[in-house]
Amino acid sequence: GIRAFLLSTEKIMWRFMFVPILMVLYDYVKPPIDHLYFSNLHRPLLGIQNTFREIVKCLPEYDVKNYPGLLLLKLHYPKLREEFEKVSPTLEKTWYHDTNPWFEKNDGYYFYKAEQFPLLNSLIRQIPCINREGASFAVIEGPMVLHPHRAESNELLRYQLTIHGDGDCSLYTDKGRHVHKEGEDILFDHARYHELMKTSDGRRVVLILDIHR
């Protein structure tokens, strides 16, 4: 009786041991596959968390309307654009390739932190769903391609509000194409496939925010 109990317990334990392995593999094989996935010791742990969130919290699609506070930003779009034009020339640029080795060197791709813009900063502080840490204005000057990629963690969603754009810049997600048109916004899961293509010599400016699920 005891031996049979131990054997059955051992079988159950082995089955449970496979659960986290399957959760990691599920996260790993999502396109586009990151071939450096297992070079980061923390990534498999994030993979388990990502898979758990997909089971519990993830939706097929995300809508800005379900996060009412974000409407405040869109309503203030004209003033946010005006503030950007006034304040940004007085600030130093931070280039993406200096903050993350994933980005290719590109002097036309940089950002300004949201905290440097008083109106924007005050609005953000009124919206509880926003994670203020990474809030920024992202600027692209000239043609550019961001190849297919995805964030390491799906803990946060990604919100974008286009401040400047003439329709020459497109964001592609697993839900289709979003054209960066002035005053238009989008909310998506940036831990899933997305890429970007900009074809003209003009400037595109987007407000980027991380959103709590």
Task: Name these PLM-found stretches.
Residues 189-191, 205-212:
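C-terminal, beta-strand-rich globular interaction domains
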Residues 164-182:
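A short beta-strand-loop-beta hairpin characteristic of the jelly-roll/cupin
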Residues 161:
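Basic nucleic-acid-binding interfaces
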